[in-house]
């Protein structure tokens, strides 16, 4: 016997450690002829198992383990597919089990599918006779070798295999302990069965009967199923009048061409070209299906992106409304999307606003039917850090040890335990004791195994037939899922479309809706001008916080250097600012500002590269060059581009000669041809799809346009989308303030869960207030909408439900200013809390009873809290300051010291900052130094205090204190940081500065005020302070007089003139 008929692979989640690759390797070495995959209830591993078997020339048998029941008794049963129909029966049976969450399978279910299946009962006892008899007369019925001897039936040796070798036995109890969230010692007591994958030699020692061997061989011969890949499973689109899909598609396209007045012959020729390729490849239904669901979205208040990926290079997509990018206008190539010389399924990914994406999926489900639409499964795996913690937990490691393990494994994508073991600290932990060594060995054996299923973020499978005819299904959090991954589902021919949720589309849509509602202005984003100077000024200033694709510090720096003037500049920046092409940014910017420096290898390259100043940025440019120079068709050019990006030497050499020969036939010099080939080879590795860049740059431009023209609504919606992130909220509020937009405290009668734009400014969200959850906010808003605005603090306290009314909620709302609208100081309202909490809750809900039985309430008026305390409470309850940041306030008061801010300071100038975080570390030499995070009320920046300076300041610096710092600015990891050389407490710096001052300059002051007459001194006095007036308009300095250098005179100057107009020198 050279077949194993009962293998549980690692896709039997947390019930097997048998990896398919390792299984097949061992089976091939041992000489196995056939293997049967029999995971319990699921078929997750079928494609991988099938492919590995075929590659190893091993006969794959498809099966499944189920627990069959008659309602009284349950028996473990293995079912195997005899043929392709049997394989489909397994798809349907597994789908039914998983969709209905059945752990035991009724006899009737199996009888429905058993015609093309082989049934093998395991460890059958007399009590199972009724179950077995239900299949009486079935020819392909077997009992495994250790079933009860008194039962009649054909016998076959069948022992489940769940791990590879005997020394892997401990993996099963470990997996079960992880699955059951229990300790390994408790599981070990129950696990006694030997379930390793045996060698052929071990099988021979079993002395199996001839009947068992004959029956095993019979089963192997009977099972002849295979997975059918690359089937034509595209659903058919139902046309309105029974037309063929081809005719209906052409009718729509011609109508749109005329309707949109695209009368240029080039459009008609391009359309004919694309239409022929699409219909020749049989994809007309695909385009109609995608067009239909996008049409639904656009007519049902769901915003759709302008395009994504290479599909924006298609005129057919544009005319069908799938994209809003005219490919001829932007010189985009259809063959980059759909290549007739490399037949693959088209791949149109669609961006929907993320808050309404489910609406479109629901439409598709309703249109095609419940079992005709599904998501796609993905698998979470036991990766290094996760498996190390899981195994540590089941082995009884305490939390301290588990945290130590997490810290010892480097935070590196894809790191393995073996790689972590190379670190001395990790190795020392492993060998600290025997328990740790065992932990490490078990962890390594489980590392990488699939742990759980999840749902692919975007992929949706659509068919006009039930999907379980082609692949098994299961359920996930969002509904049905294929049991096979995205690539596996696509490989068998199923239509997959990515429905992606894009937050920025939700922001754009909300701005449009709110502007319409509040200002009665209809914003048509397809009609906005793409030469708006205000937009390009915004981009040139780098004011792109919140702008899709353009908000990182690095991109903002590039925009400032580039000074964009055209939409093409945005397209170039979004394409260049990526690893690889980033090194070409400086070249691009230099040439952009100095077009005369651009040189081309050959004049024929100029029309292709002129827009990018001789720099190859886009994949389409490579294709255009190959077509122009070597005479390649666009299909051939796309194949060349792909070959170049994959760096396959053999293919590259072949393509190189192909290119040079083609160029020679076109009359190009051989040396020039080689240089051009090498040029495109250099850029092919990171060339960006221009169609995608144009599409996403359009979103970036739209957001920039809205930011410029509707800033209140822009910031309100951006802020609403970062609720929960203090850092992002604080940064965005900071920027809004600097744009002179008023940030208003939460208002109990105006604010919502989201931020609200108004003609006064932006009301903060009630959701930003710490200690107030969503449900409380919802109840407050619901009550206000149902019964009108709150009249005063007492009215609010009476109307909100008792279950949410407490001191913490009321204090939070008061201290952030939510009740300021009622005209009482926050101190007064704090004093009133005890009154409202003492109200008789039994009568609160009845307004008449309340008025009759409750004494009239009144406020005990209190003077307002100090400004600093109000600011501190704002920071405490919101995470940021509504009013000016304390550092900004201090800066305004202390400008006479000649201090600067981080944003406008330069090397070794005094800068006023607050330290938000201080991280002290020890260097390799054992010296202390510190990394600090500073802010000046507007800008945040990292700072470094090296050991030689830190020893001087170590005891005097603390978090959330203000200092004057001097140092040198340096760029590190694309971010500016300050190397701090000197540090002063503000008062100490001021004392030193004033004491050493020899003169004072007063801006735009022509004479001293009378109060300084008594302070004047003669010019020869030692302690004289010279006073000068500076006339800005005339750029002229005038001596105004001298006063004594005394503190009281300094204070008098500061009180008399604005701090911004005084400079002590």
Swiss-Prot record:
Q: Which SMART domains match?
A: POLIIIAc
Q: Enumerate the SUPFAM superfamilies for this protein.
A: AF1531-like, PHP domain-like
KW Calcium (keyword) present? no
Broad class of enzyme this protein falls into: transferase
Q: Where in the cell is it found?
A: Cytoplasm
Q: Which GO terms describe its molecular function?
A: 3'-5' exonuclease activity; DNA-directed DNA polymerase activity; nucleic acid binding
Q: Which family does it belong to?
A: Belongs to the DNA polymerase type-C family. DnaE subfamily.
- PANTHER family listed in its UniProt record: DNA POLYMERASE III SUBUNIT ALPHA
Q: Describe, as the record does, how this protein assembles with itself and its partners.
A: DNA polymerase III contains a core (composed of alpha, epsilon and theta chains) that associates with a tau subunit. This core dimerizes to form the PolIII' complex. PolIII' associates with the gamma complex (composed of gamma, delta, delta', psi and chi chains) and with the beta chain to form the complete DNA polymerase III complex.
Per its database record, what is this protein's job? Answer: DNA polymerase III is a complex, multichain enzyme responsible for most of the replicative synthesis in bacteria. This DNA polymerase also exhibits 3' to 5' exonuclease activity. The alpha chain is the DNA polymerase.
Q: What is this protein called?
A: DNA polymerase III subunit alpha
* Organism of origin: Staphylococcus epidermidis (strain ATCC 35984 / DSM 28319 / BCRC 17069 / CCUG 31568 / BM 3577 / RP62A)
Q: Which gene encodes it?
A: dnaE
């Amino acid at each position: 016997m050279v077949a194993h008929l009962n293998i549980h692979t690692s896709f039997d989640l947390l019930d097997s450690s048998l990896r398919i690759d390792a299984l097949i390797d061992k089976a091939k070495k041992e000489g196995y002829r056939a293997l049967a995959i029999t995971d319990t209830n699921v078929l997750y591993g079928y494609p991988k198992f099938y492919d590995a078997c075929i590659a190893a020339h091993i006969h794959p048998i498809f099966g499944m383990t189920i627990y069959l029941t008659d309602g009284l008794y349950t028996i473990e049963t293995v079912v195997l597919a005899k043929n392709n129909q049997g394989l489909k029966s397994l798809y349907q049976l597994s789908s039914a089990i998983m969709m209905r969450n059945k752990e035991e399978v009724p006899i009737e279910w199996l009888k429905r599918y058993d015609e093309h299946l082989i049934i093998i009962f395991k460890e059958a006892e007399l009590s199972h006779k009724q179950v077995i008899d239900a299949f009486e007369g079935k020819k392909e019925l077997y009992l495994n070798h250790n079933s009860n001897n008194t039962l009649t039936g054909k016998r076959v040796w069948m022992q489940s295999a769940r791990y590879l070798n005997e020394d892997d036995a401990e993996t099963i109890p470990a997996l079960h302990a992880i699955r059951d969230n229990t300790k390994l010692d408790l599981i070990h007591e129950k696990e006694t069965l030997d379930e390793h994958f045996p060698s052929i030699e071990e099988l021979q020692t079993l002395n199996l009967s001839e009947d068992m061997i004959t029956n095993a061989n019979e089963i192997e011969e009977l099972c002849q199923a295979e997975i059918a890949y690359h089937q034509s499973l595209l659903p058919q689109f139902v046309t309105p009048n029974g037309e063929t899909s081809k005719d209906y598609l052409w009718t729509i396209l011609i109508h749109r061409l005329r309707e949109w007045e695209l009368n240029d012959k080039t459009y008609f020729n391009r359309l004919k070209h694309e239409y022929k390729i699409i219909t020749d490849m049989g994809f007309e239904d695909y385009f109609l299906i995608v067009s239909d669901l996008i049409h639904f979205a656009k007519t049902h208040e769901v915003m759709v992106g302008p395009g994504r990926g290479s599909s924006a290079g298609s005129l057919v997509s544009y005319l069908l409304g799938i994209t809003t990018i005219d490919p001829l206008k932007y010189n985009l190539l259809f063959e980059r999307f759909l290549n007739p010389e490399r037949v693959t399924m088209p791949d149109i990914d669609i961006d929907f606003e993320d808050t309404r994406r489910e609406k479109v999926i629901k439409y598709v489900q309703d249109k095609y039917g419940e079992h005709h639409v599904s998501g796609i499964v993905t698998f979470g795996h036991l990766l290094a850090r996760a498996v190390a913690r899981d195994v540590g937990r089941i082995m009884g490691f305490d939390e301290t040890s588990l945290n130590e393990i997490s810290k010892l494994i480097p935070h590196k994508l894809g790191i393995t335990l073996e790689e972590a073991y190379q670190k001395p600290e990790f190795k020392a932990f492993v060998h600290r004791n025997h328990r740790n060594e065992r932990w490490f060995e078990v962890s390594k054996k489980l590392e990488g195994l699939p742990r759980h299923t999840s749902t692919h973020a975007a992929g949706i499978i659509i068919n006009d037939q039930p999907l379980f005819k082609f692949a098994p299904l299961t359920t996930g959090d969002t509904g049905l899922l294929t049991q096979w991954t995205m690539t596996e589902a696509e490989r068998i021919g199923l239509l997959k479309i990515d429905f992606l949720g894009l937050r920025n589309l939700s922001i754009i849509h909300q701005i449009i809706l709110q502007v319409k509602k509040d200002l009665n202005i209809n914003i048509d984003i397809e009609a906005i001008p793409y030469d708006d100077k205000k937009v390009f000024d915004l981009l040139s200033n780098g004011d792109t916080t919140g702008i899709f694709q353009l908000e990182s510090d690095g991109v903002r720096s590039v925009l400032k250097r580039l000074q964009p003037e055209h939409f093409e500049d945005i397209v170039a920046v979004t394409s260049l600012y990526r690893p690889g092409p980033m090194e070409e940014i400086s070249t691009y910017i230099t040439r952009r500002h100095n077009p005369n420096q651009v040189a081309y290898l050959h004049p024929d390259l100029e029309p292709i590269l002129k827009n990018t100043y001789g720099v190859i940025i886009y994949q389409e440019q490579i294709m255009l060059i190959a077509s122009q120079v070597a005479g390649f068709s666009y299909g051939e050019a796309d194949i060349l581009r792909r070959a170049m990006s994959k760096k396959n030497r053999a293919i590259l050499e072949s393509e190189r000669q192909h290119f040079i020969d083609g160029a020679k036939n076109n009359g190009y010099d051989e040396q020039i041809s080689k240089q051009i080939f090498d040029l495109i080879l250099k850029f092919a590795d990171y060339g960006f799809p221009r169609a995608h860049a144009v599409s996403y740059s359009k979103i970036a431009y739209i957001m920039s346009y809205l930011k410029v023209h509707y800033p209140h609504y822009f910031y309100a919606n951006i802020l609403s989308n970062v609720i929960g992130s203090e850092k992002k909220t604080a940064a965005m509020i900071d920027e809004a303030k600097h744009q002179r937009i008023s940030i208003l405290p939460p208002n109990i009668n105006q604010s919502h869960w989201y931020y609200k734009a108004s003609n006064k400014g932006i009301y903060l969200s009630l959701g930003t207030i710490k200690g107030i959850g969503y449900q409380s906010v919802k109840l407050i808003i619901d009550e206000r909408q149902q019964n009108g605005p709150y009249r005063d603090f007492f009215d609010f306290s009476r109307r909100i439900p008792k279950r949410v009314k407490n001191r913490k909620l009321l204090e939070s709302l008061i201290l952030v200013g939510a009740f300021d609208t009622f005209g009482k100081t926050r101190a007064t309202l704090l004093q009133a809390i005890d009154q409202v909490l003492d109200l008789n809750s039994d009568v609160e809900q009845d307004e008449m009873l309340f008025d009759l039985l409750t004494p009239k309430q009144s406020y005990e008026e209190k003077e307002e809290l100090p400004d600093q305390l109000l600011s501190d409470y704002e920071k405490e309850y919101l995470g940021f300051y509504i009013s000016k940041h304390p550092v900004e306030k201090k800066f305004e008061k202390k400008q006479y010291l000649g201090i600067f801010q981080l944003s406008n300071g330069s090397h070794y100038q005094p800068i006023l900052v607050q330290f938000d975080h201080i991280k002290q570390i020890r260097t390799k030499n054992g010296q202390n130094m510190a990394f600090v995070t500073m802010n000046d009320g507007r800008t945040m920046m990292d700072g470094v205090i090296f050991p030689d300076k830190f020893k001087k300041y170590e005891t005097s610096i603390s978090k959330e204190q203000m200092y004057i710092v001097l140092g040198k600015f340096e760029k590190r990891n694309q971010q500016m940081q300050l190397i701090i050389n000197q540090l002063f407490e503000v008062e100490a710096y001021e004392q030193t500065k004033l004491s050493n001052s020899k003169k004072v300059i007063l801006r735009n002051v022509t004479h001293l005020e009378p109060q300084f007459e008594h302070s004047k001194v003669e010019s020869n006095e030692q302690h004289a302070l010279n006073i000068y007036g500076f006339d800005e308009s005339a750029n002229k300095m005038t001596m105004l007089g001298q006063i004594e250098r005394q503190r009281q005179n300094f204070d008098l100057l500061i009180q008399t003139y604005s701090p911004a107009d005084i400079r002590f020198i």
